[in-house]
Regions:
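Helix-biased detector of long, well-ordered alpha-helical tracts
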Residues: 1-133
């Protein structure tokens, strides 16, 4: 795994907390955080704003690559139910939940259909499914 953190002004305690969370996720997935980049970009980000990205790369032996030639009638496909928004759903969720043109909720409001606040729902970590398989 490689990570990337960008911000307008580095706050070492915040960066340490972010990297610690990434390391926790790596441990859950049985992956290693091999490196990454931390960028201070005052012209791009306001103080206190962060951009976080990560890339995971795996290796598989050529003989074990799953392709159309290895799929047969009777094979089973497993599906796991999602338990939240996950990494790619937050931009749309923020817009739908917080924008007055849509739901217009406040961060401290209870998320409809749940017992948690909108803020708590938006801050839930993405589930790592590796061990579920």
């Amino acid at each position: 795994m490689l990570d990337y953190i960008a911000t307008g002004a580095l706050a070492p305690a915040h960066v340490e907390a972010i990297v610690s969370g990434v390391c926790d996720g790596c441990r859950q997935a049985g992956a290693a955080l091999l490196g990454g980049e931390t960028a201070e970009l005052p012209g791009m980000y306001a103080d206190g704003h962060y951009d976080l990205a990560a890339t995971a790369v795996g290796v598989v032996e050529r003989a074990k690559i799953l392709g159309p030639d290895r799929v047969q009638v009777g094979d089973v496909v497993l599906g796991l139910a999602s338990d939240g928004l996950h990494s790619n759903g937050y931009s749309l969720a923020r817009k739908a939940l917080l924008d007055p043109a849509y739901a217009g909720l406040q961060l401290d409001a209870t998320l409809p259909g749940s017992d948690m606040s909108v803020a708590a729902a938006l801050l839930r970590p993405t589930r790592i499914y590796v061990k579920s398989m």
